[in-house]
Amino acid sequence: METTTEENIRIIFGLKLKKLRTDKGLSLQQLSELSKVSVSYMNEIENGKKYPKPDKINELAKALGTTYDQLVSLKINKNLTPVVQVLNLRIINDFLFETFGVDKGLLMSMMANAPTSLSALINSVFEIARNYNLQEEHFYFSCLRSYQEMNDNYFEDIEDAVEKFKADAGINQPQQLTSEQYMQLLKQHFNYRVQESDFSDFPKLRGFRSVYVKGEQPTLLYNTRLTEQQKIFLFGKELGFATMKIEKRPITTSWLKVESFDHVMNNFKGAYFAQALHINKESLIQDLEHLFAQTTWQPNLVLALLEKYNASPEMLFQRISNLLPKFFGFNELYFIRYSSKEPSKHLKEISKELHMSRNQVDLEYIINEQNYRRWITKTMVKHLDDKFHETEGTKTFVDAVISENEEKDQYLTISMLRPMPELNNNANSVTIGFVLTEAVRRKVQFLNDPTLKFEKLGNVAELHYETPYALRKKRDEEIKMAEYDRLTKELNSSVTV
């Protein structure tokens, strides 16, 4: 999680030099006269741009009343410790400095000059992160969600890339393409080798939906147990990576290891591309208009959309979440996905979550709102679970509810529950909900349907989430990565899997 580079060493040296100089009450000009080091060069040293030669370090050490060894040592006083902790975090280097181009030396200098209260705050953040076992990937996914929320979860550049690909590939979409057709597009347009595999020779990889191996001819192995809808999404995402020329992307589905924020962002772009490619924007907008025009809640219309678009509940709801803010003005919505073997009893760690809120500055409000939305998700799944077990977990169910929280905000929430026997025998739930704003009340005609369930906020403290165990997860990643490396070597040696 931590990294010390040559650049960081320069910055640490500059911070120490500046701290020693200011502690002695010396200006740059005064230290320059004492050390015979020019003001301009010293300024570059303090800003982390230059690292002085040994003779210059000796002169600076003498002028500051310290030794050469103390000056070049990476040991620092306690006031600078939080600054260097931030500097050495790989997550900060990858995300803030590399992705967004923030000037590292300037930021560190500003932090070093800040009052000690900032150091206390940084220490507190580190302590909280340790206590709650927060990992880099949590930060990356949180930043991605914020990025989606700031853009109303609609991305014109990806929509345009989809339309261009469809035109280039000659895709006219009155009918949905099959997974076989998407596979052929990968082979014909991007020279992919696509193979089905049960990963029998690689038991640690059996839980993955797919494994990608980069090479002169890219290879995509997909699990024999995937459903048609899962293959459609998988091949569509690969088409997205290839069309948008994305290099930094995950090598497995689900994630083997989260490498960087670029990987997280690019995975989202590939997934968005797949959804937009498979579910036509204009067609779905018309279908939503028809659904909202009904004066009574019609769950069968939602299930019919799954069949029409040959899509999984998650793909359908994700695509709906792209279009509602942009084309319907439903700007306060949320999306939650989780899976569990016993959905009526507990939530496993939520695997996907998006909250678009009216109040992005009141942290307490945001936390309360997100807890409430999780609570109504669990309440919805309890309703669906009874029906689910009546069919021994073989059918997909959908239901809607109007709910109210302590602030008297009302929501319309629609949730689906479906079996997932193909990989882990879990039941998978996807939920989309939106605040009953004036825009929603004007558009959705079935809100006054007396058959719609109504729920008031219950005890959100009842929610329990399984927290990840970082060490166990890291060991598991290492084992699977070794298996992936073995598979890659065999493929590159032209051994059939």
Where are the language model's segments positioned?
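Short juxta-domain linker segments that transition from a proline/glycine-rich
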Residues: 2, 11-12, 19, 29, ...
